[in-house]
Amino acid sequence: MLPIRRGNFYDRIGRPLTGVTPRWYALCIPGDSSYATLFPFVPFAQQAQLYARRNSITPFLIEVEDDLSANGVFMVADARRYLPTPIARHLIGYLDGDGHGMTGLEKAYDDLLAAAGDAQAVLCTTTARGDLLAGTTPQVQTTARGTNTAITLTLDANIQRACEAIAAQNMSKGCIIVMQVGSGQILASTSMPEFDPDDIAASIRADDTSLINRSLSAFSAGSVFKVVLA
């Protein structure tokens, strides 16, 4: 079973902010040398899982870094949740290990986004030893359970990227917010330091408070505000 797809986020003119980059899953079949073929292409974090299941008697899917169809491996294409360089990380948030929103808009709209995608599974007909039955091929089964719901934000992806670049070059901690005059719509919102939504554990270990969205945090005005009141 593949992870259930979620509804995506788009910027104000329809540019996707999530669900763009392809992700590949390879089918590992007992007894067909899948282990040796797949190991060099499996991300480091997944190598232990592949090694532990090398003698499995049932086929299973594992994420790999490239399309290995040319190597004779049965592949299933999916989409990574976040871009290679994630955008609006604090605003969008991140998912837990079960694919549910933990922070940001991912959490606020979790029920809606979770119900938006279809479920996929790979069906195999195998022998008692786990080998594919002669004359059969794996089949991808898609269960159309999704509502195809997506969420369009007021963000402008170009302005957001520009703000993130400026923040990365000029501040270790802080935030930048761009608001449209008149409508009050938020065109960009970035917070520093940033985190990797695909590796939350690294941010926790770093202990740099990168998970705090400073755009939404309260700051004490302090003595500098006395100038306004004077």
Regions found by a protein language model. Name each.
Residues Y94-D98, L112, R161-N170, S189:
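Structured segments of extracytoplasmic/periplasmic soluble domains
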Residues T142-G182, P197-A230:
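Active-site loop and adjoining helix of the penicillin-binding protein/serine DD-peptidase-beta-lactamase fold
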Residues A88-H90, Q185, V227-V228:
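Short, solvent-exposed alpha-helical surface patches in non-cytosolic proteins
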Residues L113-T127, N170-S189:
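Carboxylate/His-rich catalytic cores and anion/metal-binding grooves
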Residues R5-N8, K173-C175:
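A conserved glycine-rich beta-strand in the N-terminal activation segment of trypsin-fold
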Residues L2, F9-G19, C163, M179-A188:
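Short, glycine-anchored, charge-dense loop/turn motifs used at functional sites
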Residues P16-R23, C28, D32, A36-N148:
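Small/polar-residue-rich segments within soluble enzyme cores
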Residues T190-E194:
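Structured interaction and signal-relay segments at domain junctions
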